[in-house]
């Protein structure tokens, strides 16, 4: 285990041991979020260990942003929603750049605003952890949309 939990996830993915992995792209990895409080929640992890966009070489940065936008479009089509929320956060052992892509639907949370207004105990409740079957179905649905754009 490294000091970066995101790098650890990348290593799991490379070893074929990340059940949430959907697709490798030129600049990053598409993975289904561990918890699905917002159905279709997806993460796009940067292949380069950097915490800020300005730390990336310009051509890579522009390609990463383009791919993130295309992944978000695929999420939108795979998991119909009213709006996509994009968030590039990071703190502690999770500063390695990764986009949180949240499909949002009218009335999907008790308060309007970012998903982080939902209490942590609800956001990360075991009831929102997809079963193996649900996860495989989500990966297949998103994979089909990614195929249309990236193949």
Question: What are these model-derived regions, one by one?
Answer:
Residues 1-151:
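HIT superfamily nucleotide-processing domains
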């Amino acid at each position: 285990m490294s000091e970066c939990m995101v790098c650890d996830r990348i290593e799991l993915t490379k070893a074929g041991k990340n059940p949430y992995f959907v697709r490798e792209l030129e600049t990053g990895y598409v993975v289904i979020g561990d918890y699905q409080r917002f159905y279709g929640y997806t993460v796009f992890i940067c292949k380069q260990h950097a915490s800020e966009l300005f730390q990336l070489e310009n051509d890579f940065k522009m390609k990463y942003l383009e791919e993130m936008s295309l992944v978000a479009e695929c999420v939108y089509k795979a998991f119909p929603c009213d709006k996509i929320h994009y968030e590039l956060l990071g703190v502690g052992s999770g500063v390695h750049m990764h986009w949180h892509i949240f499909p949002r639907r009218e009335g999907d949370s008790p308060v309007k605003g970012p998903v982080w207004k939902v209490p942590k105990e609800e956001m990360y409740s075991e009831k929102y952890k997809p079963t193996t079957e649900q996860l495989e179905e989500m990966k297949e649905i998103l994979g089909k949309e990614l195929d249309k754009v990236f193949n």
